[in-house]
């Protein structure tokens, strides 16, 4: 009788030990899990950062996966040239070559009749002729006055390559492709012994109400703001400047009670586009009080200070900032390494080890 009870006790003790071990393993795993939230206004580059994580920390895009982006890229090309042609009417810009007016009409007819995501030779020729026209180029130069995909010139300048029958999108082509994010997209990867769960949330106003579900237990927020958006208006409200919207959103996030203990990293993104734009468009279009040099460094630092000055708890909460170009893999790799180090440092601080 006694030996039976003893065997039972041993079994219970064994099970208890296994459960303890499992709980400890789960706790260790949980401690090594980093919940990362990507926030920012629409078209600030969040989804491109997610694609970079796949390239840098997973095994990149296979040829089969790249091929799946072909239809998206063709859709982006068509939407871009259509946006420019429609804006010519709105802005009252004439074609340099009168025959291009026929091409403009033909473009609209073809766009309505072709299968989505395809690029028939007839359409390619029409787009090629239009893109070469001086009036179309003049309208492209005024892209801040209407809604145009950032990658428009990247694709249109390489029309021959991307419409070749054997075309396989490169990783750079994939990075520059644009699909509006709706809902929440989760990506998992590991770096420096940490398991990341990265959540990309739609940035347009209609998508933001879905963010609240992701708030609990967030380790770090990466907030993306497009530097180049200082002279642009929102897709969803053409009365609101994109930079002002981004600042308003950042203010509500960095001072939110939910994020009192959350590390916040600011990615001032699209620095490549900003560097080109700042040579032509003065920052005072967005910040009338700005009277500094209209240089990349001075204007960039001014924008950075506009964001960082919104932090009401500077004495206890540091916000880390980086100038980024989300389509540049090396730049993102370097910056994300720095973010990972921040997270490790903050974790050690929480444990009293730093």
Curated annotation (Swiss-Prot):
One Pfam family recorded for the sequence: G-alpha
UniProt region (G4 motif), positions on chain: 265-272
Domain G-alpha, residue spans: 32-354
Expression (tissue specificity): Retinal rod outer segment.
Cleaved signal peptide residues: none
Residue numbers of ADP-ribosylcysteine PTMs: 351
Region (Disordered): 1-27
Annotated segments matching region G2 motif: 173-181
Residues found modified as ADP-ribosylarginine: 178
Disease: Achromatopsia 4: An ocular stationary disorder due to the absence of functioning cone photoreceptors in the retina. It is characterized by total colorblindness, low visual acuity, photophobia and nystagmus.
Function: Guanine nucleotide-binding proteins (G proteins) are involved as modulators or transducers in various transmembrane signaling systems. Transducin is an amplifier and one of the transducers of a visual impulse that performs the coupling between rhodopsin and cGMP-phosphodiesterase.
Recorded family membership: Belongs to the G-alpha family. G(i/o/t/z) subfamily.
Name this polypeptide is given: Guanine nucleotide-binding protein G(t) subunit alpha-2
Naturally occurring in which organism (per UniProt): Homo sapiens (Human)
Upper taxonomic lineage: Eukaryota, Metazoa, Chordata, Craniata, Vertebrata
Gene this protein is translated from: GNAT2
């Amino acid at each position: 009788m006694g030996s039976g009870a003893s065997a039972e006790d041993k079994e219970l003790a064994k099970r208890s030990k296994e459960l303890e071990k499992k709980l400890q393993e789960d706790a260790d795993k949980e401690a090594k899990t980093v919940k990362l939230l990507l926030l920012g206004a629409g078209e600030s580059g969040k989804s491109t950062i997610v694609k970079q994580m796949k390239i840098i920390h997973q095994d990149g895009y296979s040829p089969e996966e790249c091929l799946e982006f072909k239809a998206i890229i063709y859709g982006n090309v068509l939407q871009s040239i259509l946006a420019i042609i429609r804006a010519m009417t709105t802005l009252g810009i004439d074609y340099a070559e009168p025959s291009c007016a026929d091409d403009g009409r033909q473009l609209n007819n073809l766009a309505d009749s072709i299968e989505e995501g395809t690029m028939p030779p007839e359409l390619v020729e029409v787009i090629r002729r239009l893109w070469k026209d001086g009036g179309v180029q003049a309208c492209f130069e005024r892209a801040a006055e209407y809604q145009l995909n950032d990658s428009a010139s990247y694709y249109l300048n390489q029309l021959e390559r991307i419409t070749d029958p054997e075309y396989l999108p490169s990783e750079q082509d994939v990075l520059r492709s644009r699909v509006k994010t709706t809902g929440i997209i989760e990506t998992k990867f590991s770096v420096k012994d940490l398991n990341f769960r990265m959540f990309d949330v739609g940035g347009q106003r209609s998508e933001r109400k879905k963010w609240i579900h992701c708030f609990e237990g967030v380790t770090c927020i990466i907030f993306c703001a497009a530097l180049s958006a200082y002279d642009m208006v929102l897709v969803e409200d053409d009365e609101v400047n994109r930079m002002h919207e981004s600042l308003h959103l950042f203010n509500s996030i960095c001072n939110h009670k939910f994020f009192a203990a959350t590390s916040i990293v600011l990615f001032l993104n699209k620095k490549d586009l900003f560097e080109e734009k700042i040579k032509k468009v003065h920052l005072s279009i967005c910040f009338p009080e700005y009277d500094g040099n209209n240089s990349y460094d001075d204007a960039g630092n001014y924008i950075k200070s506009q964001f960082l000055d919104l932090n009401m708890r500077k004495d206890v909460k540091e916000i880390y900032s980086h100038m980024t170009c989300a389509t540049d893999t090396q730049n993102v790799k370097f910056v994300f390494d720095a973010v990972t180090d921040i997270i490790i440092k903050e974790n050690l601080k929480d444990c009293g080890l730093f």
